[in-house]
């Protein structure tokens, strides 16, 4: 098949992180046609021929399928009451210390069946796809113990088999169960990680005030590295307790949150060739101060934007995340598009297949109903996504229902 009458393809190019000035570099192919064969982009031309079965883009903009590299989208229950607590002045840390927050989701998840969690999670994923996401990272983390974590892993694998999106599975050492010692639980998590090894690609840890210490995070990630897994870390969301420095000797693909990063952290991340993932939707949910992306980009650190959808931040709309990053973190629209495509794909080890509209890559394509790509973050209040292709298959059409 082919997609014809494309107003312009707007895409970064290449297979790896874009940093510094390169993060704002995009290619433009006007009046284009995309040929799709066997789920791949076979050819891109500037011809105008039209045959039966072609899809007419009607002059719209085409961008790469968006890549959401940090999510907590698999869980049971909800935390709507917590929203009102935060609105009345309670902080994230206060709610967590009271045994709620993440711990409430742990209880809700334990009390939900795998089928219930799958159904809830697929609704959230369908919404993400409707806003242009074609690849999504799926974390465990709300089980804490092996039986419940395996339930979440099974749900993640079932989502992977749905065909709606491409997935990358991550085991997350999330929070310390009440009454457990950190050292003992870290060793226990290593055992879970070993048993999950054949089904996941990444290991992640929440290293912050009220979560795991730098020493525990380092030990866990070092163990994961020895297993050959990719490494990610939540750091500097609540406070800066030295997680970046502690893990600087490891091959961490991305340091996520980074609200309280200092100059030493930025230089460390740049020097080891890693990246920073900004999560503006969570900052929005918590009403915190947004980190300044200019500090990272101008220092030569690749910046990624992800949704961080969770019970706290019930939002997987990467276009709204781009809007927030442009408005509050001083990113250019070009940088924001790169952050949600090739940089996010590279952080998941998928840069050779995902994140750009180029010949030979997976046909993950989003048709956007705008006249210019700069309107994408601007028109955040309406869904401008017309159609979404995943591996060459139409998985979302605004005028039709999902093919679940």
Swiss-Prot record:
Its EC number is 3.5.2.7. It holds the Pfam family Amidohydro_1. CDD domains: Imidazolone-5PH. Pathway: Amino-acid degradation; L-histidine degradation into L-glutamate; N-formimidoyl-L-glutamate from L-histidine: step 3/3. Coiled coil: none annotated. The keyword GTP-binding does not apply. It catalyses: 4-imidazolone-5-propanoate + H2O = N-formimidoyl-L-glutamate. It is found in: Cytoplasm. One of its GO terms (molecular function) is iron ion binding. Catalyzes the hydrolytic cleavage of the carbon-nitrogen bond in imidazolone-5-propanoate to yield N-formimidoyl-L-glutamate. It is the third step in the universal histidine degradation pathway. This is Imidazolonepropionase. It comes from Thermoplasma volcanium (strain ATCC 51530 / DSM 4299 / JCM 9571 / NBRC 15438 / GSS1).
């Amino acid at each position: 098949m082919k997609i014809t009458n494309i107003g312009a393809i707007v895409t970064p190019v290449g297979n790896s992180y874009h940093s510094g000035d390169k993060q704002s570099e995009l290619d433009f192919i006007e009046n284009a046609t995309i040929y799709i064969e066997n789920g791949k982009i076979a050819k891109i031309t500037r011809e105008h021929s039209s045959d039966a079965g072609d899809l007419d883009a009607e002059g719209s903009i085409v961008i790469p399928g968006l890549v959401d590299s940090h999510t907590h989208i698999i869980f049971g229950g909800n935390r709507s009451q917590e929203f009102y607590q935060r609105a009345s002045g309670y902080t994230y840390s206060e709610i967590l210390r009271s045994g709620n927050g993440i711990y409430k989701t742990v209880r809700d998840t334990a009390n939900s069946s795998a089928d219930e969690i799958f159904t809830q999670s697929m609704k959230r994923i369908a919404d993400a796809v409707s806003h242009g996401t074609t690849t999504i990272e799926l974390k465990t983390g709300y089980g804490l113990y092996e039986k419940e974590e395996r339930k979440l892993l099974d749900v993640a694998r079932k989502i992977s088999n749905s065909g709606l999106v491409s997935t990358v599975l991550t085991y997350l050492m999330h929070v310390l169960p009440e009454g457990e010692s950190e050292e003992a639980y870290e060793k226990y998590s290593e055992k879970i990680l070993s048993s999950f090894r054949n089904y996941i690609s990444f290991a992640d840890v929440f290293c912050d005030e009220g979560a795991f210490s730098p020493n525990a995070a380092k030990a866990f990630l070092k163990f994961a590295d020895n297993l050959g897994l990719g490494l990610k870390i939540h750091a500097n969301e609540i406070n800066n307790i030295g997680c970046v420095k502690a893990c600087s000797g490891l091959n961490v693909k991305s340091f996520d949150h980074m609200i309280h990063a200092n100059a030493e952290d930025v230089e460390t991340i740049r020097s080891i060739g890693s990246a920073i993932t900004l999560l503006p939707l969570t900052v929005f949910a918590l009403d915190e101060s947004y980190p300044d992306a200019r500090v990272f980009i101008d220092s030569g650190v690749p910046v990624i934007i992800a949704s961080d959808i969770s019970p706290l931040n019930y939002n997987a709309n990467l276009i709204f995340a781009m809007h927030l990053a442009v408005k509050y973190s001083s990113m250019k629209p070009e940088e924001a598009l790169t952050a949600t495509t090739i940089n996010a794909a590279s952080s998941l080890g998928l840069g050779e297949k995902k994140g750009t509209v180029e010949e030979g890559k997976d046909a993950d394509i989003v048709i956007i109903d705008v006249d210019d790509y700069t309107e994408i973050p601007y028109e955040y209040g309406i869904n401008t996504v017309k159609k979404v292709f995943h591996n060459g298959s139409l998985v979302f059409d605004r005028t039709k229902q999902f093919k679940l």
